[in-house]
Amino acid sequence: MKHFPSKVLTTAILATFCSGALAATSDDDVKKAATVAIVAAYNNGQEINGFKAGETIYDIGEDGTITQKDATAADVEADDFKGLGLKKVVTNLTKTVNENKQNVDAKVKAAESEIEKLTTKLADTDAALADTDAALDETTNALNKLGENITTFAEETKTNIVKIDEKLEAVADTVDKHAEAFNDIADSLDETNTKADEAVKTANEAKQTAEETKQNVDAKVKAAETAAGKAEAAAGTANTAADKAEAVAAKVTDIKADIATNKADIAKNSARIDSLDKNVANLRKETRQGLAEQAALSGLFQPYNVGRFNVTAAVGGYKSESAVAIGTGFRFTENFAAKAGVAVGTSSGSSAAYHVGVNYEW
């Protein structure tokens, strides 16, 4: 529905009031009703398209009085859709359903299979109702009341079946609405059963009256009773459809449970991955520290002169880590020497590395 600008609506309202100021009272009533209709259409447009603080809104009193005001934040908050409008709410809902649809496609296909079976049963119910209508057409004027009741029952049953089809089509939009839709179907079918019982009761009363007034009504009463039996059979078929609808709802519940289990497993895996990331980070740091310490140790010198000690120091690094090494050595002969060293990283939490070596030359 188109959203009317407030200036256009205001002009329409003033024109409606002013154009017939000198007309009769009945014309004033017509113009007032037309104005109320315009305002109602504007309000309907806001309910569909939404509104925000500062826009013009109209209130219609019980006596038809129209009040114009600027919408406040409180008016937006008090709105059923928080000012978003039915169109935006449906868009958001559709987006949410589309995001969740990939996770439940397999389960929804299973539900759709059950729905197709239910639709077949409902088609059988339609055929049974058609037979009921044909039998009711043959009822005489003495059973007109019975015929009217059964016809009403058949029409209401068809209406309920249409509602069931509409609710089943909504399964593709959101799984969460399955249970509510099927409950509505069950309520409608319960009401249908009650009306069928009332129709049978009325048929029995009409039969008794017909026997007292007309001899040939027996055969037609029997036909009417047969029609009532078919109506009860149709109601039974509808009950079977409701049972299958409940089974589909149970499957939907299983789907939700599976989704919850998957979410819990994903959460556990996420925790394990976080722990693994931490361990990898620690290993990376220790590896870099070790390489830095080895670089420092490799820079230490051994003594050259026979009978001499030496003290040596060196630094080393690898990427962001660095280390300091110190060492000492002693040359026993021209051919034989020994040395030892230790290195420590400069960052906190570093471990020490060391080496001891001998050298023999010939």
From Swiss-Prot:
SUPFAM superfamilies: Pili subunits, Tropomyosin. The signal peptide, cleaved at the inner membrane, guides the autotransporter protein to the periplasmic space. Insertion of the C-terminal translocator domain in the outer membrane forms a hydrophilic pore for the translocation of the passenger domain to the bacterial cell surface. The trimeric head domain (about residues 24-169) is highly antigenic, it sits at the end of a coiled-coil stalk (about residues 170-307). GO terms for biological process: cell adhesion. Induction: Barely visible in early log phase, levels increase to a maximum in stationary phase cells (at protein level). Transcription is repressed by NadR (FarR). Residues 308-362 are annotated as: Translocator domain. The gene is nadA. This is Neisseria adhesin A. Keywords: Cell adhesion, Cell outer membrane, Coiled coil, Membrane, Signal, Transmembrane, Transmembrane beta strand, Transport, Virulence. Residues 170-307 are annotated as: Coiled stalk domain. Forms high molecular weight oligomers in whole cell extracts that are not disrupted by boiling in SDS buffer. Homotrimer. A fragment containing the N-terminal half of the mature protein (residues 24-210, head domain plus part of the stalk) binds human integrin beta-1 (ITGB1). It was not seen to bind immobilized purified CEACAMs 1, 3, 5, 6 or 8 nor commercially prepared type I collagen, fibronectin or matrigel. Its main location: other. Pfam families: YadA_anchor. Residues 24-169 are annotated as: Head domain. Disruption phenotype: Bacteria adhere 3-fold less well to human cells, a double unencapsulated nadA-saiD deletion is 3-fold less invasive, a triple nadA-opc-siaD deletion is about 10-fold less invasive. No change in invasion of human epithelial cell lines that express or not integrin beta-1. Bacteria clump more in the presence of human Chang cells, few clumps are associated with human HSP90.
